[in-house]
Amino acid sequence: MQNGAPNGMAPQVEVDSSTFKGTTIVTENKSIAHELMTNTTADQNAFIGKNKAVIDIENSVFDKTGDTTSDDNSNFRGQNAVVLGIEGSQINIKGSNITSNSKGSNAVFATGEGSVINVENTNIHTKSDSSRGLDATYKGTVNGKNLTITTEGAHSATLATDRGEGTITAEAAKLTTSGEGSPVIYST
């Protein structure tokens, strides 16, 4: 039961992404290398960059399991994503692997004006439904270069924007989807 009504009956209210929880949350400039960042809890992220931090990540592994409990929050705000950039942060990821095997676990998600994620020379693989590769909403930006992105679940585009405000760029990317309703590129 949510909001006093059975699941699916009450309208869902999007929450403020600044309240999201995660395994690793970075709020100041930082460099990270050769790290394993995982999360197995519903509605949490493996990694969150926030507070206008500039974060450089190399040769690391990110993994997420644990299904979302709110489609709206995971689709539009980035809750339950593997890597989430908010509050004008800039996350630069190189030479890494990003995977998820849970519903509503987008791999790389930027939301909010000034939030930018640059991903290069990285493999991305999502296995469950509503789990996109690169996703941006509310004026967030994700730039990809030399990527292999594979999605297996339904409604899991490799490149996606939503809410009419989001920017994705992809250069030298191999993009593969196999789930129902999963175009390679999706934008609204």
Name each model feature, range by range:
Residues 36-39, 61-67, 97-100, 123-126, ...:
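Beta-rich extracellular carbohydrate-active architectures
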Residues 113, 141-143, 150-152, 164-172, ...:
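...the same signal can extend to comparable exposed beta-sheet modules
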Residues 7-21, 41-48, 70-84, 102-110, ...:
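Extracellular beta-strand/beta-solenoid scaffold signature
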Residues 1-71, 92:
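N-terminal segments that cap or nucleate solenoid repeat domains
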Residues 91-125:
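Surface-exposed, polar helix/loop patches in the mature regions of secreted/periplasmic/lumenal proteins
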Residues 15, 26-35, 54-59, 90-95, ...:
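All-beta strand scaffolds that present successive hydrophobic residues in beta-strands
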Residues 32-35, 69-71, 84, 95-96, ...:
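Intrinsically disordered, low-complexity segments enriched in polar/charged residues with Gly/Pro
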